Amino acid sequence: MHKTSEQTLIFEISKAGRVAYSLPLPTVDEVAAEELLPAHLLRQEDVELPEVSELDLVRHYTALSNRNHGVDSGFYPLGSCTMKYNPKINEDMARLPGFAHIHPLQPVESVQGALGLMYDLQEKLAVITGMDEVTLQPAAGAHGEWTGLMLIKAYHHARGDFKRTKVLVPDSAHGTNPASASVAGFDTVTVLSDERGLVDLADLKSKVGEDTAALMLTNPNTLGLFESDIVEIAKAVHEAGGKLYYDGANSNAIMGIARPGDMGFDVVHLNLHKTFTGPHGGGGPGSGPVGVKKDLIPYLPKPIVAKTAEGFVLDYDRPESIGRVKPFYGNFGINVRAYSYIRTMGGAGLARVSKEAVLNANYMLARLKGAYDAPYDVYCKHEFVLSGRRQKALGVRTLDIAKRLLDFGYHPPTIYFPLNVEECIMIEPTETESKETLDDFCDAMLQIAKEVEETPDVVLNAPHTTVVKRMDETLAARKPILRYQPKQEVHV
């Protein structure tokens, strides 16, 4: 059977002798590789690279690109990921020659504009979060978590307090929290949630103590609920001598409305590729700046951009610093995009962003909670969780619902996270989606709920319209095929 271009590997359309590009003539004398490299470094067999024409190359990758789904092609309600629209003006700003055509090793006097942007971004992020100083070095959220925990470790060790080896993490936390704590050399202690979906204060107080380095907390949490006991939580941690760490993954709910620093947090990381519209994933990279209160400033990674009478400089004179956490000064291009977004929106605009993100989430929750179980039937913040346990009782799981959504042209929400909600469906619409889009998605979810009751096989066998149908995900995880292996010719 003939395979379409979407089903064929580029290796499978290779024909010997075909080329996609004519290389220019060399401008230097040609020298054989054997004259330059020792024999053990030379390839003994031809490399198996595809030989295709330019037209075949373009058609192949264009077909593959049409299978991608991103915020520019459709609704992307991935909970706890803030898949908001990335304004294209940010791309224009990042491509300005003064930002795009410079090198981090240039003399500082020749990159004053870039350093000025970095300094102003540090200042603005400090104001937004209620922190006293910010570093732009961390490359993404988990990297920011690790950096923040290393700052906390440096703080405790500088005080001769080496017994603080434990980091408390709620059972609803992002998986990166315990992972970052482990990589930073801490032991993780899980704090339970109560019947409200919030931190169980009694459980927290029974576990915080002289060995506590920090509590990592997201507020609002991953259930989309605001930790209303945050002042008492901060008091319990601080009285035990620990620090309070803010995972900024859900900051889109509180910008311009509440600040982590005012809640009692000592360290904050932000995800500029989420909350502040830097592109995600293949459109990245990310950026995870970390802000701290005054007593942690000495330990920040160096250098920090500082302002002097002569201009902006890179301040390396920080003897207590934990050192660099990334080459140079962070993912500068994403920082430019975030700065453009902040300057465009202004303080009032950022507050409106959060209000509309919360409004959109509550609107969707109100429409869907009749067809799906809502474990916490209260007002949410920027995201909310549903449970597919009602559908599971009819033989259809959350995974099946997610697969069926593909037929409607939607990227599925986050599923099976947080772990403390059975058959979890986690939805975050963000502020950039219209009511019409929200209604269309809710209509699809309601139709699927009806199908589960009336025609379950339609859901169980979904997706029906995508190029790739159901895969054996267990086999793919256990026996992945990670590279192309040409079939061996059989000679009779």
Curated annotation (Swiss-Prot):
It catalyses: N(6)-[(R)-lipoyl]-L-lysyl-[glycine-cleavage complex H protein] + glycine + H(+) = N(6)-[(R)-S(8)-aminomethyldihydrolipoyl]-L-lysyl-[glycine-cleavage complex H protein] + CO2. It comes from the Bacteria. GO terms for molecular function: glycine binding; glycine dehydrogenase (decarboxylating) activity; pyridoxal phosphate binding. NCBIfam families: PRK04366.1. The glycine cleavage system is composed of four proteins: P, T, L and H. In this organism, the P 'protein' is a heterodimer of two subunits. HAMAP family: GcvPB (MF_00713). This is Probable glycine dehydrogenase (decarboxylating) subunit 2. It comes from Exiguobacterium sibiricum (strain DSM 17290 / CCUG 55495 / CIP 109462 / JCM 13490 / 255-15). The lineage of its organism: Bacteria, Bacillati, Bacillota, Bacilli, Bacillales.
